[in-house]
Amino acid sequence: MENKENQKSISRRNFLKTSVVLGGVASLAAVTGKVFASSAVAQGFSTKEKFDTIIANGMVYTGEIKAPVKADIGIRNGKITAIAKLGKNCDNWVDATDRVVCPGFIDIHGHTDTNLLEAPLGDSKIHQGITTDIGGNCGYSPFPFSDEEYERRKNTLRFGYPFWQNIDGFYDALRKNTIGINYGSYVGHGDIRHIVVGDNDVAATPEQLKMMCKILDKQLEMGAVGLSFGLEYTPGSYGRTEEFIALLKVVAKHDALYAIHMRNEDDRVEEAIAEAIELARRSGARLEISHLKAQNQNNWHKVPSMLKLIHDAEKSGMDIHFDRYPYTAFSTGLDCFIPLAQRQGSSKEILARLENPATEKIIREYALGRVKRLGGPECILIAACFAPGNEKYTGKYLNECCKISGKDEWETIKYLLQSEKLNVNMAGFAMKEDNLRTLLNDPLAMVITDGSVYSPKGRLGQEAPHPRSYGSFTNYIGKYVRDQKFCDLQTAISKCTSVPAHQLKLKDRGLLKEGYCADVLVINYDTIADVATYGQPHQFSKGIDHVFVNGVHTLKNGEYTGCKLAGVII
């Protein structure tokens, strides 16, 4: 199955010896080193000012879709204070000759959340160049909690820290722990609905809806970047249109972002896009469609019509974008093989339905049908099991798991769900490579991981995450931009930096510009690559030579410097 994702990049000639196409015109900067004018780059020499760091002699990509320039970058007090020819008047001089220098990458759709307390450096993300990470996606966030749940859990320790109730408590825990990357979070609609309405398929009453809006307003006031929906999951899928619109009007009031994991990403994907757009139209909220895809072979032809729906909305004046990770396999929970109607209620209630002959028959038929639509058991990877004795299933495809268990496909799925109390991670290989290229190359697209922070060490190193958690951005730049040349480097970098910064309303990140926060990468364009695989995911990317987070030299020659972690809450 590894051949479905060729993640090894082929070495190329130094990027300075190749031309970069911009607007159909070859940029001579890559060939001659000629300095081009840019609105973000000053010209001339500056040797009087002393800097904390000078990144010298690199090809500077500002994050704008403009030709690169050969220049130095001066950093002082965590900010970019000069972009020019600067000499060596500094405490830390970094030679970036033959290297790309660009803004730190912004992962607008991640699931890092509480993992950042276990791996505060942000190991798997910072090694692929991510300096800002946005969590709380797909309708789930590590907050808020009801008064009752907070009282029940506040005296327990979570990763060694007191429990929190709202976003401000979670942010405080991150600050006290210190973090190596910048972090912000959506608030999950599913969590709000769970608190107020519960986990069953019922409409919110007017009073409940008023309470949901009040909770959302509070989280946004405390710093949430927006509201995320996970309409393929419970309990978010049980919300009604009126509920969504009322909540999104609160989002629009704050000029925050509305992100949606749509109700369907396969047979009814076009209808799901239309629903997402209609909710944005009726509420006035800015829309981010999460990990846009067409799953299963019988839906691969739908990508052009999907994009037409999105671009028609954008042409009508709607603020709409989408994001995507550069892999043809998705990642989710094994409970996706249970139909939504059977996922109501608590885990105990759901597990009981696996024992009831009538409901088990319904679930079995749905599960086997979905296995077939995904391409068979050889297209389903069990990414993480946690129960003692189940380690042998981690990293194995479903057909391999069947051989280990001595059971058929359904009985193996059922056993894993029961023994793991529904908590099983999986990956499904259900997407087409050509569609992936089309989506990534769209002007409204941004690059994401859709993954969490991991580390090869400790508990997190025992899991088998999707390789995107270690290599989405390096895979995109190395495989698709350098090797396959489907867009110029400045456009690619903008999708990873300035475009998500604009969507998040970040006023001082996403560009290399005087006065901006010094989140800066030095990249070896010849070697940048994702080396993580589905079988061996815990491998750091190659080619990210240096990473600066708020001016602090966090990675040097690809290794953690031991510095005090400098990430902030955005």
Predicted features along the sequence, with ranges:
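Divalent metal-binding pocket/active-site signature
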Residues: 221-276
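Histidine-rich, glycine-flanked metal-binding segment
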Residues: 24, 39-53, 59-104, 119, ...
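N-terminal export leaders
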Residues: 12-28
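C-terminal cap of metal-dependent C-N hydrolases
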Residues: 356, 438-444, 449-450, 454, ...
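Active-site neighborhoods of metal-dependent hydrolases
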Residues: 174, 179-182, 186-206, 212-233, ...
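Metal-associated gating/positioning segment near the N- to mid-region
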Residues: 93-165
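Acidic, glycine-enriched loop/beta-strand segments at the rims
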Residues: 52, 61-72, 424-430, 435-436, ...
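N-terminal secretory signal peptides
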Residues: 1-14, 38-39
